[in-house]
């Protein structure tokens, strides 16, 4: 340990002081509250001996939807941004290959697929946005949440979604919705609860724990537990910012961000089931073990026919 500390001190002393302008994901979701925000605001300054810091804010605080995030990064408005790959795929369809709706049904396989696709994403981020991709991570499984009006409904096949207005945020999810006869409606995550209240949408697609944290249980009755992906997400730096950093600062990020990425995947694995439990009848606890209210949604498991439809 002493040798490590001795070796690391010169690197810190050689660092140039820098404050980064950073955008995280949504303020009310746990990736920001427990990992993204703390990394930039607490861990980075500590690891760098105060040399590196960040003015880091969530999409929610900045009033951003997430769809525009890479354009702002390219313009140099921000130094680094966290985002969802399918939110930015309208500008670069190849990016969506990391998260095709319904193709992969388990998180382990999904992570391997994203890692395999990483080199393609790295190239696309650099060529399209002048950005350096430094992290890939996921969210709990993307499932359907619907206001069916009657909680006595205990079964609901995908064929019954015909004519329903369903919130989406990507082309691939929109294709799935159209494929089952629904009508895809693109709505930013932060605006979905009022959209469901007003009938602009009948159902929405999002992750299990994000749905709970965003209080979707206040406006929907059912959780249709068909997995349509895990919302592949990223951290990217503006390439000019990255290249302007001294080698000691770059080395710190390249050493520490893989650790943060691993924490993201571990949390996602835990939060998938936790979200389903919290949205339904429990048990429901936060990450520290404190009791939380349950959402009271009726869970509906996919039928064999529904599972087969995903493979078509």
PLM regions and their residue ranges:
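Hinge/lid segment of periplasmic solute-binding proteins
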Residues: 112-130
């Amino acid at each position: 340990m002493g040798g490590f500390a001795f070796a690391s001190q010169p690197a810190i002393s050689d660092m140039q002081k820098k404050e980064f302008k950073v955008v995280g994901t949504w303020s009310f979701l746990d990736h920001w509250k427990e990992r993204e925000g703390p990394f930039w605001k607490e861990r980075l300054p500590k690891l760098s001996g105060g040399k590196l810091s960040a003015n880091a804010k969530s999409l929610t605080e900045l009033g951003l939807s997430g769809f525009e995030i890479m354009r702002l990064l390219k313009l140099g408005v921000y130094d680094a941004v966290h985002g969802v790959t399918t939110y930015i795929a309208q500008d670069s369809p190849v990016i969506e290959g990391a998260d095709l709706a319904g193709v992969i049904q388990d998180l382990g396989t999904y992570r391997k697929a994203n890692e395999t696709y990483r080199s393609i994403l790295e190239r696309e981020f650099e060529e399209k946005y002048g950005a350096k991709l430094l992290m890939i991570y996921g969210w709990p499984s993307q499932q359907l949440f619907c206001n069916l009006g009657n909680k006595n409904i205990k079964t609901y096949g995908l064929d019954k979604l015909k004519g329903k207005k369903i919130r989406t945020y990507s082309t691939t999810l929109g294709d799935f919705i159209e494929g089952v006869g629904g009508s895809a409606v693109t709505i930013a995550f932060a605006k979905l609860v009022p959209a469901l209240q007003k009938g602009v949408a009948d159902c929405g697609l999002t992750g299990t724990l994000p749905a709970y944290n965003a209080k979707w249980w206040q406006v929907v009755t059912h959780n249709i537990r068909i997995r349509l992906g895990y919302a592949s997400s990223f951290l990217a730096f503006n390439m000019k910012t990255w290249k302007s950093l001294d080698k000691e600062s770059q080395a710190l990020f390249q050493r520490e961000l893989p650790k943060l990425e691993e924490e993201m995947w571990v949390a996602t694995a835990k939060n998938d089931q936790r979200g389903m439990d919290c949205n339904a009848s429990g048990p429901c606890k936060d990450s520290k073990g404190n009791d939380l209210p349950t959402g009271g949604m009726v869970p509906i498991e996919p039928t064999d026919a529904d599972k087969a439809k995903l493979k078509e």
